[in-house]
Regions:
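Glycine-rich phosphate-binding loops that contact phosphosugars or nucleotide phosphates
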Residues: 1-114, 118-127
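Acidic, Ser/Thr-rich low-complexity intrinsically disordered segments
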Residues: 154-170, 190
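Generic alpha-helical secondary structure signal
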Residues: 36, 61, 129-136, 172
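Internal, active-site/partner-interface "lid" segment
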Residues: 127-160
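Short linear proline/tyrosine/threonine-rich motifs used for host-factor recruitment
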Residues: 183-185
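Ala/Thr-enriched low-complexity intrinsically disordered regions
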Residues: 166, 176-179
Length: 192
């Protein structure tokens, strides 16, 4: 599953890829600063693949060319765009429409983010066992590596709360423990 969203659509593509990675093993978020770089990342796309292209006015020509390339390679093309008349739909077999008529110099991502969120939730419901297994595994990893739990700053007293206290080592204890090993622990070790 390839996902492409360029310029103001990049955060949408990133959000979609983040959650798709929890559900699927084969997600590739396309990063690009040039058209050729985009095609290099897609060189192996084929009939068993899908690409999701996200683009809104003013439509990205690089996204459109990526969808054309995928279509020419017989990949399934899905678009998330603002209208059935969007040029992004030229190569698409499935169009997810997120109309946003907001007249502003700032692109509103509310409507497309809602469509993406609904897509993620629908797929999670379809793949409940796989997603539950992945989330259980991630919870264990997050707990082990203290990703979320009790590692916030307490803004009242500016102290860091950690579930596991920092371990301080005495330099002599480390030297004694590793005297016969060829392990370099360097000056970055927390020692007193």
């Amino acid at each position: 599953i390839y996902i492409v969203g360029i310029r103001s659509c990049a955060p949408l593509a990133s959000f979609l890829a983040f959650y798709f990675n929890l559900m699927f093993d084969n997600v590739r978020l396309l990063h690009t600063s040039s058209s050729s770089e985009l095609f290099e990342q897609m060189v192996r796309i084929g009939k068993d693949d899908a690409i999701i292209g996200i683009s809104f006015p003013r439509y990205s020509m690089r996204t459109l060319k990526a969808l054309e390339f995928a279509n020419n390679r017989n990949a399934k093309v899905i678009t998330i765009t603002d209208s059935v008349h969007s040029p992004m739909n030229l190569y698409s077999s499935c169009n997810l429409i997120a109309d946003s008529d907001m007249a502003s110099i700032v692109d509103s991502l509310v409507a497309p983010l809602s469509v993406i969120n609904a897509l993620i939730v629908a797929l999670c419901m379809k793949k409940q066992k796989e997603v539950a297994g992945t989330l259980t595994m991630l919870e264990d990893i997050w707990d082990e590596y203290q990703v979320y739990e009790n590692d916030e700053i307490n803004y009242i007293d500016d102290s860091i709360k950690m579930r596991y206290p920092a371990i301080r080592y005495n330099r002599k204890d480390i030297d004694a423990k590793y005297a016969n090993n060829k392990i370099y622990y360097g000056e970055d070790a927390i020692c007193s």
